[in-house]
Amino acid sequence: MWMHKKILLKLSGESLKGDSSYGIDPRTIKKIAWEIKEIKDLGVKIAIIVGAGNLWRGRTGEELGMDRSQADYMGMLGTIMNSLALQDALEQTNTITRVMTAFPVSSVAEPYIRRKAIRHLEKDRVVILGAGAGSPYFSTDTAAALRAAELNIDVILMAKNNIEGVYNKDPKKYQDAVLIKHIKHQQILSQRLAVMDITAASLCLENNIDILVFNMLKKGNIKKVVLKEGNIGTVISSKGE
């Protein structure tokens, strides 16, 4: 069976809220957990980074007049909350997990240590990485690219909330937006397509990390992407078309 053997799954915080406007939807997070278990049972080694858009948005901090660093740390704490919720949902499926955070939260998680994270993956534990990169001004997309490079993972599965992949323009604003099936990292950078921030895209380019952008809300899509079935979403790589 041809499939990705080792992945970093980047979940947007919004993917956890389902159809709700805020927070964590119990049915949605359970569905995600079972889909992760399904690919775990195929022998795939899995690291996960979760965003916090379901709990905290940077623009809220701006509206409050908050210091950018303070607002970013709130976002990092939100990712830890999401990581713990996902850990619990996964463990209800009898999937062994470890939550590791970029700064110490010793009562609830392990500190992120690269060699220890690699060891967890080798022992077939799902590693959930909280607190982003651990520093303000760096997005969870950048954290995903950084951790993928550190953990020798050559593909990031970027799960989106009801977005099929990368478009030539915003599909929410333009009905004639076209889904791009395959694109180069260089094009993401030069065209400034709204897939991820420039720092994350540059890291992936420099370290030959492919990115697969797909719709998380369609049941079975994670497995299809891992097994390279169905031509789902958008592939971003150094090879292009």
Swiss-Prot record:
Signal peptide start-end: none
Residues annotated to bind UMP: 72, 133-140
Disulfide bonding pattern of the chain: none
Gene Ontology biological process terms in this record: 'de novo' CTP biosynthetic process; UDP biosynthetic process
Keyword entries, A-Z: ATP-binding, Cytoplasm, Kinase, Nucleotide-binding, Pyrimidine biosynthesis, Transferase
Regulation of this protein's activity per its record: Inhibited by UTP.
InterPro entries named in the record: AceGlu_kinase-like_sf (IPR036393), Asp/Glu/Uridylate_kinase (IPR001048), Uridylate_kinase (IPR011817), Uridylate_kinase_bac (IPR015963)
Binding site for ATP: 10-13, 53, 57, 161, 167, 170
GO molecular function per UniProt: ATP binding; UMP kinase activity
Its EC number(s): 2.7.4.22
GO cellular component, one term: cytoplasm
Pathway where this protein functions: Pyrimidine metabolism; CTP biosynthesis via de novo pathway; UDP from UMP (UMPK route): step 1/1
One Pfam family cited in the UniProt record for this chain: AA_kinase
Main location: cytoplasm
Catalytic activity as recorded in UniProt: UMP + ATP = UDP + ADP
Subcellular location as annotated: Cytoplasm
NCBIfam families: pyrH_bact (TIGR02075)
Family as reported in the entry's similarity comment: Belongs to the UMP kinase family.
Quaternary structure and partners: Homohexamer.
Role, per record: Catalyzes the reversible phosphorylation of UMP to UDP.
HAMAP family: PyrH_B
Name of this chain's protein: Uridylate kinase
Higher taxonomy: Bacteria, Bacillati, Mycoplasmatota, Mollicutes, Acholeplasmatales
